[in-house]
Amino acid sequence: MSGYDNDFVSKLEHSKEVVRDALNEYDKVAVACSFGKDSMAAIHVAREVDPEIPIFTILTPYKPVETFEYLVDMDKKMNINPIVYLVGKEVPPILKDNNINVKLLPTDKFETACKEAEKESGKPIYEYDPDKCCTLLKVDPTKEAVKDLDAWVCGLRNTEGRTRKDYKEVEKRGLVKINPILTWTEEEVLSYLKENEIDLHPWYSKVFPDGRRIRSLGCAPCTVPIYDNQEERDGRWQGTSKCGGECGIHTQRLK
């Protein structure tokens, strides 16, 4: 741990202890992964405690192609072996060709909502009703992913934005949620990934002419670059009432 200061060494050990306690208390536990920086840190911490802990991810038709490519790349490098939940009729070729385990979910509700959004506004659903879009493509699939779990682990952090300041390391509301890196800073996450030679999603390396960059990763239409003096999640859902907010996975009961 030569690359860490003493404060972070203590913080890291505490994060592992949070995961260890969860695994000792609950039988069925899995880690949720968005393949953003925080998820990758959470996965690595959890796998340090239990190398066999299951991983699941929720993909959407609007995720950038780089996310699919990054998933495949990191699966090979880290043996993540994720179960992918996706509202769709066909497994994306890149996932099929690389033997990624994909569970396709029905598309009828999403297709109906898309048609209604287009008819009522002339806009795609992610612009007209981002809450419904997130519910159908993220929240409902997450409910499917966790239905047999006793607890789930995620990379939520309380310094990401205004909506995450009051979360606890262990949340017990319907389904137990474990937030082992809750108190980590953005800088600590990036340092941890670098120290452990974990590649970042390529979108994080994009720097725009005005100095803005991607700091929180989501679906392509709903992710924009922001300045360093903004909160990390300010680049999510800009131009909508959800700006800097939540998709619903962390605010709605999942079970």
Regions found by a protein language model. Give the residues of each.
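Nucleotide-activated chemistry modules centered on ATP-dependent adenylation/adenylyltransferase
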Residues: M1-K255
